[in-house]
Amino acid sequence: MNEHSEWNSKLTFLFAMIGATIGIGNIWRFSYVFYTNGGGSFFIPYIIAILVMGIPFLILEYGLGFKFKESFSKLLHDINPKFEIIAWMLVLFVFIVAIYYMVILSWDFIYFLNSFTFGWGNDPAAFFATSVGGSSDFGGIGSVILPTFIAIIILWALFWLVSNNDVDKGIGNISKVLMPLLFIIMSLILIYSFTLPGFELGLNTLLSPNWNALLDVNIWLAAFAQIIFSLSIGQAMIYTYATYLSEETRLIDNVFMVVLANSIYEIFVGLGIFSILGYMSVTSSIPITELISEGTSLIFVVLPEIFDVMGPVGRIIAPLLFLSILFAGFTSSLALFEPLLSSVCDKFNWSRRKGVTVLAIIACCGSLLFSTGISSYLVEVVDTFVNEFGILILIALQAIIFTRYVDVDELRDVLNKNSAIKVGKKWKFDLKYILPAMLIVMWIIGVGQLIYEVDLFKLGIYVLITFLVLGLSVFFTRLNPIHDKE
């Protein structure tokens, strides 16, 4: 970029980092993963995954961004020009996530507007299929869901207004407002949920431990997967935010605060959602196991049904919940957008304003492709492929490259300089050997699952995304090489 921005305060950076990590997945995925993988006993692999993978990799990204202060593509180019293509592949995959992420936010935005009057009617599932997210019925592939189409345009316009500013004035200021509000809203929902009849049933269902589950390797893999995507590690988002840091930042201390805030929030959400599910089970005599779900089914079908049962109180809780999802998702989308923006602006010497405008228009057009009658199904297919095939292996490659081609010992000194919490040689060993091994195993299992479940439509999407990302990565790598541009 022509100019290099900085966060104007440590608090601004902290809120921005929390906003980057807390997202939709914390709300609609964590509680389900927790419940289906041993309940209360899941805390053990969850905490170990944080200590072994989450914190060490975040510390690495903080250190790299703070030290080098350049775009992710330029960083890998400077390490070795052959590695630049890896950087472009990663930031492009993350950009694709930003594209469909905004589609999910558009669904939430529609539900937020309808939550004051329960506009989804008596059948939230039908409302979602016909007016919001469509279904897996390919008969709707040629149709456009107008509310989603309009909501996408509105959200990308709002996104442009925020991201178009200097990072501190745009991302920083909105994070300082939305993050405290996010925790306040979720705390209110949690407190209220504890007053509902049946909340004990929900909490017991969620927290009852299954100690035998700890012997299942899949439980441990689920914990590590949750941490990877909950903390957004290895996706160049954290690295890019860290490039805007000043010299006085306590890097490692900040990592621990971000991880703590992320975990507290998703645990709060899990407790609140299961308390509400317990209430629904008691009042409707439906077994709670039949209510438990994740993703779109939980947020856009099950919870609206519960809000209907709540009556007038539901008209307060529902808007608050959908607003919290909107806040969490919007700040995460800002972070998802930043790696490609930084790399493109650095590559072509664009101003931030030009980069944001060009990429936001492209992203908006991409999001609109998801507004057809198979919107939710398409999002699911793309999300699974991008994360399990694309991003996971690229995170492993980062760990391998950075621990072998960057002076990690020198980086450790930089990290320890202003931090009360220090890292030692075990941190380097973890990054160099344990993390890559874990990530490669997870990637192999994920690819195996993709192959097992593939059909002609999914295969077509996978091939299209692969060629698109590879083609653009080669194009960006060869066009106007970074080392020739001054």
Feature map (PLM): residue ranges:
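C-terminal membrane-solvent junction of multi-pass transporters and transport-like membrane proteins
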Residues: 348-360, 386-461
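Transmembrane helix-boundary motif of multi-pass solute transporters/channels
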Residues: 12-49, 201, 237-242, 253-256, ...
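Hydrophobic alpha-helical segments and their helix-loop junctions in multi-pass secondary transporters
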Residues: 57, 98-124, 183-207, 279, ...
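Extracellular loop-to-transmembrane helix junctions
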Residues: 5, 34-60, 86, 147, ...
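Inter-helical loop and helix-membrane interface segments of multi-pass membrane transporters/permeases
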Residues: 2-5, 33-37, 70-89, 102-168, ...
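Membrane-embedded translocation segments of transport machinery
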Residues: 2-11, 172, 176-330, 334, ...
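Transmembrane alpha-helical segments of multi-pass small-molecule transport proteins
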Residues: 12-18, 88-91, 119-164, 232-238, ...
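Membrane-interface "cap" regions at the ends of multi-pass membrane proteins
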Residues: 1-28, 57-62, 66-78, 85, ...
